[in-house]
């Protein structure tokens, strides 16, 4: 359940849907496994996984939701070879060339015949709705997956006025300034990884890892006009992260010491531990968002 990535969105209007109403809305779009002829299925699933019993898990007016996606695996090469074989057979038997429309129809038939025998894979994406911040945090490094989740949530609720998080000043400008100064605003602390890009159309990209970012070798690239587009940071003693210029957060990792804060809860009651971990994570992510917005100079005015 501990989030590993953050794709960030904000509401244009306050989110005022209570837990019970949210649960009811999502219930009409619950996940069901693929049938023999389904290519994929997508829907909401228990927020806390197999041990959970609700689509929404709430604590302190923070709502955790989850979507599950199942996709049939049909290798393109398998379809291509089967199609070529059937096309060759038909063209040989009928002594003619098949039209594109016929080939497309034949391809659909092949896919239909292969679906019942195809393996499938499932993936899950969680999101945390934070009415107090008017934000949604999606645990995904993929903007596409995040948008899929939001699209289904919008369908369930009827409307969802959200936009990607954006700041008054470009994120890369702030990251570049931090690197020049040799430190990030407290409670953030720069680590030993960064990616710098030239703003020129055909400019270069330089990546530093496990290196002191205060060294002249690094700063020399700033002097040539490169800007910082990725920067590894620590948030206090609780979270390690990689902040990117699109305001997304990758490689989010809660420290063992921080997670141990719930050790007194134990593991005898898995649901109690999951609930405690969710409350702990939610509280720290709210603190992280407050600090991030302040460090980056504030959010751009929302467009209603």
UniProtKB/Swiss-Prot annotation:
GO terms for molecular function: double-stranded DNA binding. Keywords: Cytoplasm, DNA recombination. GO terms for cellular component: bacterial nucleoid; cytoplasm. Pfam families: RdgC. Its main location: cytoplasm. The keyword Cytoplasm applies. The keyword Cytoplasm applies. One of its GO terms (biological process) is regulation of DNA recombination. InterPro entries: RdgC. It is found in: Cytoplasm, Nucleoid. It comes from the Bacteria. HAMAP family: RdgC (MF_00194). May be involved in recombination. Belongs to the RdgC family. This is Recombination-associated protein RdgC. The gene is rdgC.
């Amino acid at each position: 359940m501990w989030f590993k990535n953050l794709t960030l969105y904000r509401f244009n209007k306050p989110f005022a849907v209570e837990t019970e109403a949210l649960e009811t809305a999502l219930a009409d779009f619950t996940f069901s496994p693929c049938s023999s002829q389904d290519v994929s299925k997508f829907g909401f699933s228990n927020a806390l996984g197999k041990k959970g019993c609700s689509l929404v898990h709430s604590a302190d007016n923070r709502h955790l939701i989850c979507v599950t996606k199942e996709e049939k695996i049909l290798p393109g090469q398998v379809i291509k070879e089967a199609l070529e074989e059937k096309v060759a057979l038909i063209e040989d038997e009928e002594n003619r060339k098949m039209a594109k429309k016929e080939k497309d129809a034949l391809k659909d038939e092949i896919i239909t015949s292969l679906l019942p025998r195809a393996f499938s894979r499932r993936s899950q994406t969680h999101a945390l709705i934070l009415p107090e911040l008017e934000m949604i945090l999606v645990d995904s490094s993929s903007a596409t997956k995040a948008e899929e989740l939001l699209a289904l949530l919008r369908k369930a609720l009827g409307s969802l006025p959200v936009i990607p998080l954006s700041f008054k000043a470009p994120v890369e400008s702030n990251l570049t300034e931090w690197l020049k100064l040799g430190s990030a605003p407290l409670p953030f602390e720069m680590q030993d990884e960064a990616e710098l890009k030239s703003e020129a159309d055909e400019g270069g990209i330089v990546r530093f890892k496990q290196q002191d970012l205060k060294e002249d070798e690094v700063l020399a690239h700033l002097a040539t006009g490169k800007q910082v587009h990725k920067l590894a940071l620590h948030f206090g003693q609780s979270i390690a992260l990689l902040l990117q210029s699109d305001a997304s957060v990758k490689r989010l990792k809660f420290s063992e010491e921080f997670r141990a804060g719930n050790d007194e809860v134990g593991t005898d009651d898995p649901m109690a531990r999951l609930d405690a971990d969710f409350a702990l994570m939610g509280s720290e992510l709210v603190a992280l968002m407050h600090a991030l917005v302040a460090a980056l100079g504030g959010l751009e005015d929302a467009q209603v």
